[in-house]
Amino acid sequence: MFSTRLSHRRGGNLRQAPGETKFGRGALLAFERLGFAVDLAKRMSSDELQNILDKTWSGLAKAVDQVNHPWRFPALGTQGLDGPNVRTMVLRSADAAARQLTAQTDIRSAKVSVFRKDPRVAWYFFDPQTKVQVRAHGSVTVHHDNEVTRAAWAAMPEANKHNYAMPPAPGSPIDDPSLGQAPAGDEAAAYANFAVLSSGITFIDWLQLGDEWHRRAQFTWTGGDWRRAWVAP
């Protein structure tokens, strides 16, 4: 804190003591209050960023269980064999503690080879009501016939399992659209085509559009925690 001690000159005039500040007590109190206000603002800003991160993950978790949630069907972008590509997926799980999002697919799908060649992906979510956009970057691990797929398969409704029993692989040419309908086939054969895509998230870009101004924040995984920062929209 600034010192406010003053020394007397001869004749009654005041002079500044060596090493002392020229500011008066009122100015010093103002500086002190300003510093407190800045510290408080920083703490509030940090708390708000953490709240945004927490709400983002809780919103993703809700989307898993709520069919009508706007984040239920995200777009998933990849760097494909022939360039960038994007497709709509169904969000199957969201785990904040593990920083993990999952989806499911047919192991015969062309995108599986894309993930295996370059596992980097970008998830895109948008809520038109709150005008919140979330982009999440990470890497995909393809699970096939292991503990992860067995647990997911056991929890899957029977009707959904039929989707993996189609004889033609996804993307194969067919003569009639009806040939692409999944029959009620052998469950073991259907399971053999089932895969889980697990994506570890390392970066989140959050943007909220407003009528007068927008807000944007970024969260980067550092290996032990999320680095949080406001950025220009």
PLM-predicted stretches and their roles:
Residues 30-233:
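Binding-site signature for planar aromatic cofactors or substrates
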